[in-house]
Curated annotation (Swiss-Prot):
GO terms for molecular function: structural molecule activity. Disulfide bonds: none annotated. The keyword Hydrolase does not apply. This is Capsid protein 1. InterPro entries: Capsid_N, MCP_C, MCP_C_sf, VP_dsDNA_II. It comes from the Viruses. The lineage of its organism: Viruses, Varidnaviria, Bamfordvirae, Nucleocytoviricota, Megaviricetes. Its main location: virion. It is found in: Virion. Keywords: Capsid protein, Virion. Gene3D superfamilies: Adenovirus Type 2 Hexon, domain 4 (2.70.9.10), Major capsid protein Vp54 (2.70.9.20). GO terms for cellular component: viral capsid. It comes from Acanthamoeba polyphaga mimivirus. Belongs to the NCLDV major capsid protein family.
C-alpha cells in the first residue's frame, strides 16, 4: 500500500473535529465576483499660495463617486547658497529626516464645514513606525524624502563659485492617514454628499524647522519657497446600479479619529502626571517625548547616515580647535587677547594658546605635530610659531564632565609654504585615540559651561531639528520613559511597567512593526491597526484618566542638566471610534466631544 493511502485510511474519532462534514476544499479555487468599478488618481489643488508656515485648503472636486487614498504632493526647492561667502565662512545644509512628515504641522478633514478628524506630522511619523510593513520601507523612504541625497550634510568651501547647488529639487508624496485612506471599505462617498463639500486643510511648518544648517547658510540662503503643492486623490468610479444605490440610501460608517490635547511639558523632574481629556471608545494610546535639545539646538557635528563618521569628525574638529587659526583655518600671528586658565594664570593668545617653535625650512618632509601629549610632542626650532591650547585651559567642557579635548588624540600634519617660509594650515592626519561617545555628541553647544574653541571651528556648528527623534540621544536611541502607569478613576489600569514594555513588548504584540525607541503604546484592542473592533475603553464614561510617567533617572548624573530640561515635551495621542452618518446629501458625526 502506498504511504499516502496508508495516511488516508488512518482515520479515527479525533479526525471528525478536523474533516467531518467538510466545508472547503484546497483543490478547487473559490472566488467571489465583485461590482464593476474603476480607480483613477486625480490631482486637486489648494486655494491660494501654500508654503512654509502657511495654511490652506483643497476642495475635493466631485470628479468621481468615492475617494480612498490621498497623497500630499510637495516639491522641495533647489537649495542654493546666494550669500557673501567671504563674510560668513563655512556653509552646511541638509533637509531633516522624513521631511515629508516633518514638513506637515497639521492636516484636517472637514465635511460640510464641520471638522471630522485632524492629524499631525508627529502622528504621521508614529503611525508609520508601528504600522508600515518592512517590505515598503524603501518606497516610503523615497516618498517621504528620507534618502541620503536630502538628509546628508552638503558642504561648501570658501573657494567655490557663487550660487552653488547644495540640494536638488525633490518631489515628496506623503500618504495621509484619515479613516477612509486606510480602508477601501470606508471609502468616502462623494455621491452621497450632494449638499456638503469635502475639504482637506494642510498647515506647513516654518522653513527653518525643516533643515539642519550652519549659521553661514542661514545668513545667506534667502527665503525658501515650496515649488509645488497639491493633492493626488484616488477616485472610484462605480457602475450605474451601485452608483444609484450609494446616492439614494443613507449611510452609517464606523470611523476612527485621532485625539490630541496638545504638547505637555516634561519638566526637569524625574516624573510627571498628565490628565487625559479623551472621549469616546479608545482603542489605543500612544505617547512620545521630544527632547528640546533636538528642536533647534546647536551641535558641533551631525551625520544621520553614520554616527560613527560624526564621532570621527567631532574628534578632528576638537584637535584642530586647539590651534590658533584665523577665520579660514590658516595659522594666524601669535598674540591676541589674554584668557585665564584653571590655574588662575593668564595665557596670551587666542583663548590661552601656548606657542611651540616650528622650523618649516627643511623641505625634505613636512613636519607632523603630535597633539595632547606635551611630554612627547616633537620639538621644533625656528622663527615661526604655531599654537596649542595650554593644558590648564579648558576647550569644550561641562562642569560635571571632563574636557572633550582630553578624550581625543591624533597626529596633525602642518602644511607649509616653503618658498615663503611660513606655516599655512593644519590637517588631521590620523586619530590615535577617540573616546567620544554618543552622549558627548548629544550635548548641545549651549549646555557647555566653557567653550574656548577658535571662531573658525565654531563655524562648523549646525542647528539641528529632529522631528522624528523620540529617544534620548541624538541618534534616536534610548526611551526617555523609564516607567509608566495608566490610572482610570484613580485605580491603576495595570501595574507600573518599565519603558521597554511600552516601546517594545506592546508594539510587538499589537502592531505590524516594532517602532523606533521612545514610541510608547498602550493598546486596549487586540489588533489596533484593524478597523474591526477588538476591544476598547470608553473614555466618555471615565471620570478621571491620568498617565503617570517616570523618566530616565539622571539625578546626580553627569548628564542630568542635559536631558532633564524644561524644553522637553510629551505628546499623547489616542485613537477612538465614532460614527459618521450620511443622510439626504449631508453628513455629520453621531457623537461630539
Amino acid at each position: 500500500m502506498a504511504g499516502g493511502l496508508l495516511q488516508l485510511v488512518a482515520y479515527g474519532a479525533q479526525d471528525v473535529y478536523l474533516t467531518g462534514n467538510p466545508m472547503i476544499t484546497f483543490f478547487k479555487v473559490v472566488y467571489r465576483r465583485h461590482t464593476n468599478f474603476a480607480v483613477e488618481s486625480i490631482e486637486q489643488f489648494f486655494g491660494g499660495n501654500l508654503g512654509f508656515g502657511k495654511k490652506s485648503s483643497a476642495e475635493i472636486n466631485r470628479s468621481g463617486d468615492l475617494i480612498t487614498q490621498v497623497f500630499l504632493k510637495v516639491t522641495l526647492p533647489e537649495v542654493r547658497y546666494c550669500g557673501d561667502f567671504t563674510n560668513f565662512g563655512h556653509v552646511e545644509f541638509a533637509w531633516v529626516r522624513n521631511i515629508g512628515h516633518a514638513i506637515v504641522e497639521e492636516t484636517e478633514l472637514e465635511i460640510g464645514g464641520s471638522p471630522i478628524d485632524k492629524h499631525y506630522g508627529d502622528w504621521l511619523q508614529i503611525w508609520q513606525d508601528v504600522s508600515s510593513s518592512k517590505d515598503h520601507e524603501k518606497g516610503l523612504a523615497k516618498m517621504l524624502g528620507d534618502v541620503p541625497e536630502l538628509t546628508s550634510i552638503s558642504t561648501l568651501s570658501w573657494d567655490v563659485p557663487d550660487n552653488t547647488v547644495l540640494k536638488p529639487s525633490y518631489t515628496l508624496y506623503v500618504p495621509l492617514q484619515f479613516y477612509f485612506n486606510r480602508n477601501n471599505g470606508l471609502a468616502l462617498p462623494l455621491i452621497a454628499l450632494q449638499y456638503h463639500q469635502v475639504r482637506i486643510y494642510v498647515k506647513f511648518r516654518q522653513a527653518d524647522q525643516c533643515y539642519i544648517a550652519s549659521d553661514a547658510f542661514k545668513s545667506g540662503c534667502g527665503n525658501l519657497q515650496l515649488d509645488d503643492v497639491s493633492l493626488y486623490v484616488n477616485y472610484v468610479f462605480l457602475d450605474t446600479e451601485e452608483r444609484r444605490r450609494f446616492a439614494q440610501v443613507s449611510h452609517e460608517y464606523l470611523i476612527e479619529q485621532l485625539q490630541f490635547t496638545g504638547e505637555e511639558s516634561a519638566g526637569s523632574s524625574n516624573s510627571a502626571k498628565y490628565k487625559l481629556n479623551f472621549n469616546h471608545p479608545v482603542k489605543a494610546i500612544y505617547w512620545v517625548t521630544k527632547l528640546g535639545n533636538y528642536q533647534g539646538g546647536k551641535f558641533m557635528t551631525y551625520d544621520p547616515v553614520c554616527w560613527e563618521n560624526a564621532r570621527e569628525n567631532a574628534a578632528k574638529l576638537l584637535l584642530l580647535a586647539q590651534y590658533d587659526l584665523d577665520d579660514w583655518g590658516y595659522f594666524q600671528e601669535p598674540g591676541g587677547y589674554e584668557c585665564e586658565g584653571n590655574d588662575g594664570r593668564s595665557y596670551v593668545g587666542d583663548c590661552g594658546v601656548q606657542y611651540t617653535a616650528v622650523d618649516p625650512s627643511n623641505p625634505s618632509e613636512e613636519p607632523s605635530y603630535i597633539f595632547n601629549d606635551t611630554t612627547t610632542a616633537e620639538a621644533f626650532d625656528g622663527s615661526l610659531l604655531i599654537g596649542k591650547l595650554a593644558p590648564c585651559v579648558p576647550l569644550l567642557k561641562r562642569n560635571k564632565d571632563v574636557d572633550l579635548k582630553d578624550k581625543v588624540e591624533g597626529i596633525i600634519r602642518i602644511h607649509t609654504d616653503f618658498e615663503n617660509d611660513r606655516m599655512k594650515y593644519p590637517e588631521v592626519e590620523k586619530i590615535t585615540r577617540n573616546d567620544l561617545t554618543l552622549h558627548d555628541l548629544s550635548v548641545p553647544i549651549s549646555k557647555y559651561d566653557v567653550d574656548n574653541r577658535v571662531d573658525y571651528i565654531k563655524k562648523f556648528d549646525v542647528t539641528v531639528w529632529q522631528h522624528n527623534n523620540f529617544g534620548l540621544l541624538i541618534d534616536g536611541s534610548g526611551n526617555p520613559t523609564h516607567e509608566a502607569e495608566l490610572q482610570l478613576n484613580g485605580q491603576p489600569r495595570q501595574s507600573k511597567r518599565g519603558g521597554i514594555w511600552y516601546d517594545t513588548v506592546n508594539p510587538t504584540v499589537h502592531h505590524t512593526k516594532s517602532p523606533r525607541d521612545g514610541v510608547n503604546v498602550f493598546s486596549f484592542a487586540l489588533n489596533p491597526e484593524e478597523h474591526q473592533p477588538s476591544c476598547t475603553c470608553n473614555f466618555s464614561r471615565i471620570d478621571t484618566a491620568q498617565l503617570n510617567l517616570w523618566f530616565q533617572h539622571f539625578t546626580n548624573h553627569k548628564f542630568a542638566d542635559v536631558f532633564a530640561d524644561n524644553d522637553n515635551k510629551v505628546l499623547i495621542f489616542a485613537v477612538n471610534y465614532n460614527v459618521l452618518r450620511m443622510l439626504s446629501g449631508m453628513a455629520g458625526l453621531a457623537y461630539s466631544n
